[in-house]
């Protein structure tokens, strides 16, 4: 029965184009973001391009994570790897990326994209444990992420109307009192417009006291020129991240050598 449940959860994750990744941010506070969920050899995987590696640094500080996608959740302690030469992307991700993220169909067909978009085909990889995956009914459009009773991170779907502009939001999440993060994510039909609103605060019985808001659900219409500028900015960000990424590779290599 466990194997059947795990297999169905993996199938659900494989079918999902978007999910919610929960992790421990600075100050030991849980935070979440919308991600593309992948599988690699039957193991749930979340990645960052080399331009946007903030969540990778967080997981290296605290390996407790959770991924909710397609009505299935993986949670536990993650491992991190830096796969920056594009070979792993080609082998493990390219087909999934083309299927799940429509804008990739343009990017990955550009002549010379492996050289021009080296930061896109290079990835920092978070691998989650497949053992213990379970079905979690409900949509992941609105979720709350917190530290659960077992000390690990959980991402919990929220059903019903949520008053996003309120300072005190009524929530029935089943999580212990403490810091929590409410995330709402929306995507355009072709995923050219990705939007998320994050509310961080303190969870008490039945309510979230909001302390910080970031992001927006307002639709944006980026012109082709603006999108090209965005790609150039991401390339510059990845270049600026190189020293940091190399230090992670050294650290992870040392950990593997001592393991």
Indicate where each model-derived feature is located.
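A general structural signal for short secondary-structure junctions and capping/turn motifs
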Residues: 11, 58, 116-120
């Amino acid at each position: 029965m466990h194997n059947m449940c795990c297999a169905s959860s993996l199938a659900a994750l494989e079918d999902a184009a978007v999910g919610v990744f929960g992790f421990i941010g600075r100050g030991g506070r849980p935070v979440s973001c919308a991600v593309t969920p992948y599988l690699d050899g039957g193991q749930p995987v979340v990645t960052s391009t080399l331009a946007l590696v903030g969540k990778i640094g967080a997981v290296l500080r605290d390996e407790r994570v959770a991924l909710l996608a397609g009505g299935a959740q993986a949670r536990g302690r993650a491992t991190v790897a830096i796969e920056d030469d594009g070979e792993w992307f080609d082998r493990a991700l390219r087909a999934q990326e083309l299927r799940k993220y429509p804008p990739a169909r343009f990017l990955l067909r550009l002549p010379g994209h492996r050289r021009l978009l080296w930061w896109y085909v290079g990835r920092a990889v978070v691998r989650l444990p497949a053992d213990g995956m379970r079905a979690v009914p409900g949509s992941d459009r609105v979720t709350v992420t917190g530290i659960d009773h077992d000390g690990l991170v959980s991402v919990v779907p929220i059903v019903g109307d949520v008053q996003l502009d309120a300072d005190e939001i009524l929530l029935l999440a089943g999580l212990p009192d403490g810091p929590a993060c409410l995330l709402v994510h929306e995507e355009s039909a072709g995923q050219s417009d990705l939007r998320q609103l994050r509310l961080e605060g303190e969870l008490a019985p039945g309510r979230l006291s909001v302390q910080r808001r970031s992001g927006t659900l307002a639709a944006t219409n980026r012109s082709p020129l603006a999108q090209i500028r965005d790609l150039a900015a991401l390339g510059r960000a990845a270049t600026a991240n190189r020293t940091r990424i190399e230090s992670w590779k050294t650290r992870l290599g040392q950990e593997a050598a001592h393991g």
